[in-house]
Design a protein with these regions (language model features):
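N-terminal export/assembly segments and adjacent metallocofactor-ligating motifs
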Residues: 1-222, 229, 240, 249-253, ...
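N-terminal leader/propeptide and maturation segments of large enzyme subunits in energy/redox metabolism
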Residues: 50, 56, 215, 222-246, ...
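A short, gly/pro- and small-residue-rich
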Residues: 156-177, 286, 353-367, 404-406
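A glycine-rich, hydrophobic/aromatic-adjacent loop/helix-cap motif
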Residues: 260-335, 483, 495-499
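Flexible glycine/proline-enriched surface loops and loop-helix/loop-strand junctions
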Residues: 149-150, 193-195, 237-239, 269-272, ...
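Phosphate/diphosphate-binding loops
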Residues: 356-358, 362-375, 413-425, 429, ...
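Flexible glycine/proline-rich, aromatic-decorated loop/lid segments
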Residues: 375-410
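Long, low-complexity segments enriched in small/aliphatic residues
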Residues: 452-548
Length: 673
């Protein structure tokens, strides 16, 4: 971090950190625009009535008294906390606070993590390989062929900085030994664009294709599949049925199976698109099983390592919630079971309209938001107690996925708080002191710094980088290094099972919407710049072009040229994208890199609040989504059908790409002869 005269100027990764090695993604680089954003709240505010956007400045003492009174007056179990993926350090305070009140655990649901399939993937690893659920890190650098089923790891999946480095190592070999990448997904992402083969698979068919590949390997005795103890896992697979369901011919499936088995260190990765369907649990397991069939699990050449257990319970964070947990909270709120709701996130924007969070929020008597800007959910709050930005805050986070070793990342202020904001950790510690009793006993620290010192003291006696018995030296070392991690690689490997379950099957996926009325499958995807929409208030991210379309500052819908011609659509036409639950307007982008039966829309735009750079730009594709769930209760975000309605008007999409020559080439393609 470059700081001059008390002002932050430039952010970079920590060169000592085992995951990023000094590199940073676009969203990390743009963090300065969170700190210096002109639309940040300067102090605590009260809104009366909710939804009017008439905010009255409030002294922090008055605000904390109001909240403490509300907590004390709440019915038993009627205090609730909703958040996205909050820092582990905040979870370590919120968890004991709620427990002291005999309130249910926090509901922590992150839409980007859901689109990445984190929980489904972790649960599948635990289910197949005989351990606890643990998020894997796939060793691309040591692989010689990678079959990626919808894992867009060069853009947004899990840790694109770490995976980008690993992919560079995969491609860094001598000519002919540069690794081989096959990308299975219905839309060509940046990862598919750099792959050796892109397989435009039908949405929801990833699991049956993985099963078919395994079946071919077993039947032909390819590679380590010959006499494998895991062969029975694939016994029920139907190669012809998989070809029909996926749109990938049986001949190509055979070619792919032989290619996968023909390498020494093959790796199969189940990415977000596999986990976005009602068959998520079955399909993710099917892809993972290819690694076991290839003999690439559990030894020094394992295709993946696992997130290790935390060094101490203090660093474990809170359990991540499923979409089913969110639905249960919504029902509690709607039924009057929540007197006070704390919100650390933006569920009114992040959740599908069909989830009906707006109506449930209106039923909550008192709502407290911790947003540093007025977002859609904060507009419906009684109090906004703005948190510091991360550049003004203390905290810690266990890296997940961890790479080749456990890493406890540190967070410390690089500048003094610019405004009269307050760390959310300090707010809960203050409330605990005011409430006395069990809350004070559970959270005895007067402020966040003392809490952090106590947490870091648990590292005393651990191995390098600062092996010492002195807590003060550990605290100093943690701040100097920027966290804690071993100096040498120590991956946690999965256990190789004796045999995977026999006769595994992947059922037919369900889709929301009747095919005749809604003929296209919707493929929402995470924006490389805006993420799930949290980056929309940062103009550097707004103007960052999408790597495949070069679009920015608006919302577009990607449509195959054949589909566009059939609908009479041209580039920059405005259409209505309609699902059974809602509708949005979007600009047409004619894109050959997508299946004709699929339309794709990026996440991130469509805010009605969140400041001048985010509000009233584009549309929010999350509004269209179904509330169907897959295994483990996760949202089946890729299971929505839509229709396209031309609106008879045009709006030019801001983009770097020019159509000069492109449209001419398309016309040439159509010409006879």
């Amino acid at each position: 971090m470059r700081v001059s005269n008390g002002r932050a100027h430039k952010i970079e990764g920590n060169p000592e950190h085992p995951l990023n090695r000094g590199k940073l993604c676009a969203r990390g680089q743009a963090g300065l625009q969170l700190l210096y954003n002109p639309d940040r709240l300067r102090n605590a505010v009260r809104q009366t009535p909710r939804g009017t956007r008439k905010f009255e400045p409030l002294h922090w003492e008055d605000a904390l008294v109001q909240v403490a009174d509300r907590v004390a007056a709440a019915k038993p179990g009627a205090v609730a906390f909703y958040g996205n993926l909050i820092p582990d350090s905040l979870a370590a305070i919120v968890g004991p606070f709620l427990a002291a009140l005999n309130a249910p655990p926090a509901v922590l649901y992150d839409p980007q993590a859901a689109l990445e399939g984190r929980q489904t993937l972790a649960q599948a690893v635990g289910r197949l390989f005989g351990g606890k659920a643990a998020l894997p890190f796939f060793d691309l650098a040591a692989s010689d062929v990678v079959f990626s089923f919808g894992a867009n790891f060069t853009e947004t999946w899990l840790s694109p900085v770490a995976y980008g480095r690993a992919f560079g190592a995969l491609r860094g070999g001598a000519l002919g030994k540069r690794g081989y990448l096959v990308q299975f997904e219905p839309r060509m992402s940046a990862t598919a664009a750099v792959a050796d083969e892109w397989v435009p698979i039908a949405p929801g068919a990833e699991g049956v294709v993985a099963m078919a590949l395994g079946k071919i390997m077993v039947d032909e005795g390819l590679g380590r599949a010959r006499n494998s103890p895991h062969a029975a896992f694939f016994a029920a697979a139907d190669v012809a049925g998989a070809a029909a369901a996926s749109g990938v011919s049986a001949e190509r499936l055979t070619h792919l199976a032989r290619a996968f088995a023909g390498f020494d260190r093959p790796t199969a990765i189940p990415g977000g698109t596999v986990a976005g369907h009602t068959t998520a649990a079955e399909a993710v397991a099917a892809v993972l099983a290819l690694n076991a069939l290839a003999g690439h699990v559990g030894d020094a050449e394992s295709a993946f390592s696992l997130t290790p257990p935390p060094l101490d319970a203090a660093f474990a964070g809170a359990a991540v919630s499923s979409f089913t947990d969110v639905q249960a909270l919504i029902e509690r709120m709607r039924d009057g079971g929540v007197d006070l709701l704390f919100v650390y996130g933006n569920p009114l924007y992040e959740l599908p309209v069909a989830a009906a969070f707006a109506g449930a929020l209106a039923a909550a008597p008192f709502v407290v938001s911790f947003s540093s800007q007025v977002d859609e959910t904060a507009v419906q709050a009684d109090l906004i107690l703005p948190d510091h930005t991360y550049l003004e805050s203390w905290g810690y986070q266990l890296a997940s996925p961890p790479g080749d070793r456990s890493a406890l990342s540190g967070q410390q202020p690089v500048v003094s708080p610019l405004y009269d904001t307050r760390a959310t950790t300090d707010v809960f510690l203050d409330l605990a002191q005011r409430l006395d009793g069990a809350a004070r006993q559970a959270l005895p620290w007067p402020n966040t710094v003392e809490f952090m010192k106590a947490a870091m003291a648990r590292l005393v006696g651990q191995d390098a980088p600062y092996a010492t018995k002195n807590a003060d030296k550990v605290w100093a070392g943690w701040r100097q290094l920027g966290g804690w991690w071993p100096t040498t690689a120590a991956p946690t490997l999965p256990a190789a099972p004796a045999a995977l379950p026999a006769g595994w099957t992947v059922s037919r996926p369900q889709f929301d919407g009747e095919g005749g009325a809604y003929p296209y499958l919707l493929h929402p995807y995470i924006s490389v710049a805006l993420g799930d929409g949290r980056g929309a208030s940062q103009p550097w991210l707004q103007e960052t072009p999408d790597p495949m379309t070069t679009g920015s500052w608006d919302t577009w819908v990607e449509i195959h040229p054949e589909t566009a011609a059939r609908l009479g659509l041209k580039q920059d036409d405005v259409v209505k994208v309609v699902s059974p639950h809602s509708e949005i307007d979007a600009i047409v982008y004619i894109y050959p890199g997508i299946r004709p039966d699929v339309v794709a829309v990026p996440l991130g735009q469509g805010h009605s609040a969140l400041g001048r750079y985010a509000a009233n730009k584009g549309a929010n594709v999350m509004a269209l989504l179904t509330t169907l769930t897959g295994g483990g209760g996760e949202l089946a975000w890729a299971a929505t059908r839509v229709k396209i309605e031309p609106l008879g008007r045009r709006r030019v999409l801001p983009r770097i790409e020019s159509n000069i020559g492109v449209d001419f080439a398309r016309e040439e393609d159509k010409a006879p002869g």
